[in-house]
Amino acid sequence: MTLLGSEHSLLIRSKFRSVLQLRLQQRRTQEQLANQGIIPPLKRPAEFHEQRKHLDSDKAKNSLKRKARNRCNSADLVNMHILQASTAERSIPTAQMKLKRARLADDLNEKIALRPGPLELVEKNILPVDSAVKEAIKGNQVSFSKSTDAFAFEEDSSSDGLSPDQTRSEDPQNSAGSPPDAKASDTPSTGSLGTNQDLASGSENDRNDSASQPSHQSDAGKQGLGPPSTPIAVHAAVKSKSLGDSKNRHKKPKDPKPKVKKLKYHQYIPPDQKAEKSPPPMDSAYARLLQQQQLFLQLQILSQQQQQQQHRFSYLGMHQAQLKEPNEQMVRNPNSSSTPLSNTPLSPVKNSFSGQTGVSSFKPGPLPPNLDDLKVSELRQQLRIRGLPVSGTKTALMDRLRPFQDCSGNPVPNFGDITTVTFPVTPNTLPNYQSSSSTSALSNGFYHFGSTSSSPPISPASSDLSVAGSLPDTFNDASPSFGLHPSPVHVCTEESLMSSLNGGSVPSELDGLDSEKDKMLVEKQKVINELTWKLQQEQRQVEELRMQLQKQKRNNCSEKKPLPFLAASIKQEEAVSSCPFASQVPVKRQSSSSECHPPACEAAQLQPLGNAHCVESSDQTNVLSSTFLSPQCSPQHSPLGAVKSPQHISLPPSPNNPHFLPSSSGAQGEGHRVSSPISSQVCTAQMAGLHSSDKVGPKFSIPSPTFSKSSSAISEVTQPPSYEDAVKQQMTRSQQMDELLDVLIESGEMPADAREDHSCLQKVPKIPRSSRSPTAVLTKPSASFEQASSGSQIPFDPYATDSDEHLEVLLNSQSPLGKMSDVTLLKIGSEEPHFDGIMDGFSGKAAEDLFNAHEILPGPLSPMQTQFSPSSVDSNGLQLSFTESPWETMEWLDLTPPNSTPGFSALTTSSPSIFNIDFLDVTDLNLNSSMDLHLQQW
């Protein structure tokens, strides 16, 4: 291969040589080349030069023609002061001079409009003044007067202040003296300096070398200005010239600040530490929003940890420990290092701002003993919490944290002394707030976070951050129990969280905010008054409708005796509260009612916005009843905060997770029975109060009622009415319903589609009593209600009696006062009530003991108090009077237990249920009317 390559290259070289020889032989002489015009001749004749001249002249003519084609119109040239407007013959140089002056005059007018004022010229060291005057002017101690300004022009005498145009045109070259003067732009400042030089007839050209203009511009300014230019004061120019000569270049003093050395990004040196002692003041609303978000995240973590902890332990031992330990801690530690907020004699508004002036007011957690173990990111996070700069090396960061490490050994507050921090809005709730916050200080080891927002809502998300109300609905499957059991793992985080709530800011910081808060309170009070008035108007309309309904009931139902029923309503609240600023006041309930807890996992008796206490007493055998609780409305639907009482909030059930309510066996109830051999099973649901006009009455969130069912003995079975009778009763009742719906639609209380909803409610399929299907499920799935016994699930007939209770459903679901979605009424009827006088034989003490039978179900004593008056018992059954309500009389739905139907024969006890149900709405203030409807109906 190499031999072939070398031979090939030799061949190419030989060919190249032969071609070169041929070309050298055939080349032409210089004369031939000159004759052919390829190269110029050695001696050029004169003809050649003439040809070159002609070529050049032709080129010039061509370029001129091209320029003439592209030139502007004469009108444009006149506007640009290049051509004269008049056609009079004048000499060319004078015309050009006038045009140049006109151009300069236009420039001067623009520069004069943008020039700086005399005060700026003094501050920029452009105008020479005495040092004392200059110091006073720079310190803003003396207002700049005309007498100190030797260089003030006549235009400046009208305004010594700075206009916005003047502040834009500061000199950037001299702006290092003061930081606010450093916002200058280059072009207006040089133009303005040129203006001053022209007007002062060049006297300042000696002083301002850095801002000198081209010579022709200053000369043209000295030659005289055209008509558009402003007149100049001659004496000012003369004074300035003489003074400038005498001063002979006024030297600028050196800038007090040293020049900042430019550093690369890794050589950053933090600013002086002294300036960082007090963090910059934050906007209070933004600081509150940040604090709410931080609290929300911390609570989310705590609730998730609590859920894991709850599933780890068995129910019973944890429950007893939860009952005993916090109460013992309350006895042992009544006073501790953390002073509760509720004892400080501040107004509620001041309480809402403690610890909220900035994020730095949070008390940070303790530092580890060895700072070297921390990473740089963790060190920076600790510095950020303490409001310190976070830049520098790791050693510098550790040096900044060391003084805080020494101070971090303070005693942390005990678990039993963490105080509920509530932030009421209205000033009328102050006595309730002060009295209840001391009692709610973790009496049972539960703490409850109130709403930290006392200002108008910032956004729909942040305004509803009443933390305890929003957490459980946001995390539906997480346990939102804030009643954290005192375990050594989580107590530290809880204490740091609550100490950050309690501590932080001195009351002196709050005094400056009083005037602003008073205005906010007045505005909120006006809003509350308006909303109260609207609610009263709506309540009057509902009362009128109720009166009409009562008249119809008296006319239609006088001849026939209606059958008793047992109604259970499961309701889902979707209405937005009409009083968004109303704060909730804790309501005391006696600790007589004990909470129910399931054995397998902690089921929810307490929805996030309410709680229900279940007192069960059974005799001789267990009754296992299952219930579905429909989840209550989420916090974006109800801006009201959670009930401010320490309560146990456990896992909110969904229809996929049925939870069972146990009732323990034993002869506990036998001592309370006087004549009847039947014990009772009482389930009381927490009531929610009306928002009364004086705004002192308690306001609650939506409760979630917990239902338990039991049946009576099989021996007392009576036959249901025949199918034809039930159909007739339903027909007459549905006609009455249609008439009432017409009235409501005409008055505007209901939308026009209420009639279709009513017809849908009546078309629920009937379940025959003889059938043995495993479940009896109603049509609305979100309010599904299943009934179970230990072995099997038993059907029941929800339509044994007439359907008049749908009127109440429609009133609550379609009225604008409170829309109630997915309400299902379950009724069990029989011909005659057999247990009408079941509570009549009880003395007051026995009835109270029956309600106080909390030994049956172990549970913590709830601070929520329900006062039962045993005297309010009539012949039809038990009525409870809610004594702390603002209503005149709270008429409870009294339900007498019916005879057992064949569908309930599989349930093993012979105990009826005296069943008190309330389904109410925060905005639906016609609670009296809803209860009266049931009382009139049955």
UniProtKB/Swiss-Prot annotation:
Residue positions where Phosphoserine is found in the record: S451, S455, S459, S463, S626, S630, S634, S638, S815, S862, S869
Alphabetized InterPro entries for the sequence: Myocardin-like, RPEL_repeat, SAP_dom, SAP_dom_sf
Ranges where the record places region Disordered: 48-68, 154-281, 635-678, 693-734
Bias (Polar residues): 159-177, 186-203, 210-220
Main subcellular location of this protein, as a coarse class: nucleus
GO biological process: cardiac muscle cell apoptotic process; cardiac muscle cell differentiation; cardiac muscle cell myoblast differentiation; cardiac vascular smooth muscle cell differentiation; cardiac ventricle development; cardiocyte differentiation; cellular component maintenance; digestive tract development
Region (Required for interaction with and ubiquitination by STUB1), start-end ranges: 717-938
SUPFAM superfamilies the record matches: SAP domain
Domain SAP as annotated: residue spans: 371-405
Tissue: Expressed in the heart, aorta and bladder. Expressed in smooth muscle cell-containing tissues: stomach, small intestine, colon, lung, placenta and uterus. Very faint expression in prostate and skeletal muscle.
Residue spans of the RPEL repeats: 18-43, 62-87, 106-131
MEF2C-binding (motif): residue ranges: 12-27
This protein's UniProt keywords: Activator, Coiled coil, Disease variant, Nucleus, Phosphoprotein, Repeat, Transcription, Transcription regulation, Ubl conjugation
Residue runs in coiled coils: 516-561
Protein induction: Up-regulated during end-stage heart failure caused by dilated cardiomyopathy.
Domain topic, free-text comment: The C-terminal region contains a general transcription activation domain. The N-terminal region, comprising a basic and a Gln-rich domain, confers transcriptional potency and specificity by mediating association with the MADS box of SRF. The basic domain may be required for nuclear localization. The SAP domain is important for transactivation and ternary complex formation.
Subunit-structure text: Homodimer. Interacts with SRF, its association does not depend on specific DNA sequences for ternary complex formation. Interacts with MLLT7/FOXO4. Interacts (via C-terminal) with EP300 (via the CREB-binding domain). Interacts with HDAC4 and HDAC5. Interacts with MEF2C. Interacts (via C-terminus) with STUB1/CHIP. Interacts with PURB.
Function field: Smooth muscle cells (SM) and cardiac muscle cells-specific transcriptional factor which uses the canonical single or multiple CArG boxes DNA sequence. Acts as a cofactor of serum response factor (SRF) with the potential to modulate SRF-target genes. Plays a crucial role in cardiogenesis, urinary bladder development, and differentiation of the smooth muscle cell lineage (myogenesis). Positively regulates the transcription of genes involved in vascular smooth muscle contraction.
Disease as annotated in the protein's UniProt record: Megabladder, congenital: An autosomal dominant congenital anomaly characterized by a massively dilated urinary bladder with disrupted smooth muscle in the bladder wall. MGBL is a sex-limited trait with 95% male predominance, and incomplete penetrance. Affected males frequently die in utero.
Protein name: Myocardin
Organism listed in the record: Homo sapiens (Human)
Gene, per the UniProt record: MYOCD
